[in-house]
């Protein structure tokens, strides 16, 4: 028996471990929709959209802005602002501990990044929610960074684009977070009075106080395919009305069919489509869009499991 262990079993285990270690962590990704095993470098070329089923995966705020804005001339707004636990809030865990954990996980100070720059050469300011930071919830810093972006648009007479991905107002900041709904809505009213366009792009998911304020106040409301958009979640609604909801309820396609949003745009088309739209709204020449050259990638055989 001992010879069998030494000669057969142990070498087999060692070969298995070597095989596992030869596949770098994060090199493969499973699509949450069709479960296809995708090569990470190939997925990056498609902007985290599954090439098999067109599922638009969730991406971070910085990745979102990197995709949307021109490379040159970017400047982050409100980067110095940090959240403060003014209420000394505690549920199952202290709020300050939740903040520390979220900051460590994401590398961000809070759940919104605002950045000035250009889109196809046209001055623009953009904000993007970081859903990985406490569900993209809106607190005082998120509201303030949004307002600073809007004020930049007012001062520089340029359009404002926001990419929303949020579970709503941040519970741990109580009334302070609810006040951000009014604060962000008020600054968007100023943009409208000045005739400056605000485009709201709804990504998966957008709920609660964010959907009830800034996310649905765009002059044009755009959504990515299959994004979940609503106020309360489907399960909560079903329990309240005691009825089964229609298929695809709260998906962007359902909202488009019922007139709640204006258009659905794939991630790869956002730059040219919004660039043309903003140029028309600002009475500027149609910008020239040059599609990036995508070099072919040699995809190695996918592992059996990841």
From Swiss-Prot:
Keywords of the record, alphabetical order, are: ATP-binding, Cytoplasm, Fatty acid biosynthesis, Fatty acid metabolism, Lipid biosynthesis, Lipid metabolism, Metal-binding, Nucleotide-binding, Transferase, Zinc, Zinc-finger
Tell me the GO molecular function terms: acetyl-CoA carboxylase activity; ATP binding; carboxyl- or carbamoyltransferase activity; zinc ion binding
Q: Name one Pfam family in it.
A: Carboxyl_trans
From which residue to which do the C4-type zinc fingers run? 31-53
Keyword Magnesium listed? The answer is no
Instruction: Write down the EC number.
Output: 2.1.3.15
**Metabolic or biological pathway:** Lipid metabolism; malonyl-CoA biosynthesis; malonyl-CoA from acetyl-CoA: step 1/1
Q: Where is the CoA carboxyltransferase N-terminal domain?
A: 27-296
Q: Which GO terms describe its biological process?
A: fatty acid biosynthetic process; malonyl-CoA biosynthetic process
Q: Where in the cell is it found?
A: Cytoplasm
Protein name, per record: Acetyl-coenzyme A carboxylase carboxyl transferase subunit beta
